[in-house]
Amino acid sequence: MLSLLTRPFLPIFCFLYGPQSEGSTRIQCLRRFVTFLLGLVLGFLLWKLAALNFTLGRLFVNGATDLYVFIIFVLVTGTIFMLSLPVRAVILLIFVALVGKSGRTYLRAVAFAFIISGPIANLVENAGEVARVFVCTTVLTYNLSKTRFDLMAKPFTNTLKHMRGDVEEIRHTFYELQEVLVDLKYAVENSDIEDEKYGDKNTKPIYERWGRETSRMNVSEIGNGGKELPTPAAVQERFQRNMRNRCKHQLRSGHRACLEVFRNGYRKCTTNFPSMIAKAICWPYRVDIICELDLFGNPDKICDPSAVVPQNFGETYVELLKAEKKLFDNSSQIVVNYEIKDEQFAKSQLKSAERTGQAFKEDFERQKRIFNKVMGILQKILCLFMLRMVYVSINYYVKYLNDVEFDNFYITKYFKHVDQRRKEQRIDAILPLRTYEKSKYIDVDHIFSRTHHESTTVCFNLLQFLLELVTAGLFILIDHLVVELLQIVRKRSKIVYQQDGEHEVRFNISGVGQMARLLRTTMHNFNIHEKVSTSLSNKECLPNAHVLPKKMYYQLILLYLIIIVLIYQSTTFLRMRRVICSFFYYKREKQRILFLYNRILRNRLRSLEFLIHDAEDNLATHRIQQQVNVFLWLRFSCPVAFGWIRHFKFAKRTCMICRGLEDSTFTVCGNCGLPYCDDCAEDLNSVCFQCGVVLTRGAEGSESSVEVYTYRKEK
């Protein structure tokens, strides 16, 4: 198949690298130029491979710098590829390593990077959306509760807001009441003024000022706790004395007024008449003795207040002072304030929903940044697997040149050429290979064939990769479930909060008195009339699920399919490494082929020993197979019912030597039951290696059967 693929390019290769090109300078220059162009192409591919994984564009802020680095890298790669033979081999081996174990590891790292940037990153995005929904719902709930609380608490808040104005009005009302009490206090306690001074024009301002000072004094005294109250008897006696003095003062005031009237009349009369006649006519005005007469009786008897003032006036007045003290105590310095108990707890409870949500969001963003940094570092570490491909390629190149046994099990055209030449010379040849040798060597004409070791490795790698598929599938499934859950929540959780109504509170206080006025002043702030008509929705709080594009899933599936193909056919692709090295070092390849040919010849001289050794290694596997394989157990336990399953691969026995599947030519030992294929039985000279019994195939065994039996006994 390889020759079929390379056949179209064979004329070009012969033209450039044929024997006739060795002496042509023109062809050699053309060969150099073609090699340089191929180096440029490979350099471009290497750059893309490196830039894809290490994101080198991020290292260069300026786009022109990135372009210069790219050009320099490609030119240097093309030049070295043209000049250095080892570099050519290593660069080509790097691209072959992409399809080998290192390449698979690299592609697995890329696939895991897809998982990180796809489902895992999407889980983080959706987690952020859940955080946003939580914050939004918290704010919405807070606002709804706050609206309802404000509506309920508005009378109290209005009262607190207008309390200062109400306090001033109440204080003014208290002052008006105190002004009424000042006159009464003056009449009871401070009316004992001298008779000749009471009522003069000069004393009237003193009286008014005394009233104001008394008012301030009473307020101050009340504010300071007040003075000691008088006894009822003292009040009774003082008020009666004041009433008596006031009565006498009124009588004296009448006497003075009478004298003033006579005096003024006489003056006017003498003014209007001549002096000779005035005395005769105006003499009646000189008779002011009338003013001296006690027309109403004895003043002490008339001004006696005992019959007028009640006997319990003192007690009533003292009770009035007590009531005033209780009513106006600290009324002049009213201060409305409140105190929060357990202030720290109150502050924590009064924290708004916006601050809580912002703190939650900041904490989530901080954790998200840490997660992204960790995932970024992990992704860069995975990208370092590309360096492993370079290391593996160089290692293969070194071992190919230094270790003649390394990767040397191919039956090539030159191998067949040597074997045919030996046949023509009638010397022992190798081809065709024996049955037990076919599983150890690969014929390059059958490019898809594998050795037994390669088949085992492929199965193990497929099982290992299956675990990675399960892990990736779990991440994808979890992401899909989260997205579906968020979409269901968005579809079925939309709520519209509609509030329509009227909230009215009215306090009606009847009465015209001072207390009714005070109550109306205090309680009018509790009156409220609010019409509520609000419509709120949680639409903004519904989650917006972040869905991965289908393109990502297609790319991931395609990548996994490529990895599976590479695992299954990795051995086929890796054989290109030998082809590349043999192309550049064909003499070394001839040495390796001749070494392989001679090694097979040497092994055939000891073939019997190798056959028995392989059979002993396979014996344990055969016994386990007999116990574990249910189909084999059914086939041999119930041959009548399940004999038909012998036609299927899973119910067939394998040869003890070459592990080939059972066919019609198989020979089974009659003593121990070990199976052998026809070729391996012939190589063993028809003698069972386990028990030494001759294998019956319709013909007698050769003389070498005794040799096999003796070898078994010695072992």
UniProtKB/Swiss-Prot annotation:
Pfam families per the UniProt record, alphabetical: DC_STAMP (PF07782)
Keyword Lipid biosynthesis on entry: no
Segments on the Cytoplasmic side according to the record's topology features: 1-32, 88-109, 395-457, 575-715
Keywords: Cytoplasm, Cytoplasmic vesicle, Fertilization, Membrane, Metal-binding, Transmembrane, Transmembrane helix, Zinc, Zinc-finger
Residues annotated as transmembrane: 33-53, 67-87, 110-130, 374-394, 458-478, 554-574
GO cellular component, one term: acrosomal vesicle
Protein localization: Cytoplasmic vesicle, Secretory vesicle, Acrosome membrane; Cytoplasm; Cytoplasmic vesicle membrane
Summary of the tissues where the protein is detected: Specifically expressed in testis.
Any GO molecular function: zinc ion binding
Annotated membrane topology: Multi-pass membrane protein
Span of the signal peptide: none
GO biological process: sperm DNA decondensation; sperm plasma membrane disassembly
Main localization (coarse): membrane
InterPro entries documented for this protein: CSR-E3_Ligase_Protein, DC_STAMP-like
Entry function: Component of the sperm acrosome membrane. Required for breakdown of the sperm plasma membrane after sperm entry into the egg, which is an essential prerequisite for successful fertilization.
Protein name (database record): Protein sneaky
This protein's encoding gene: snky
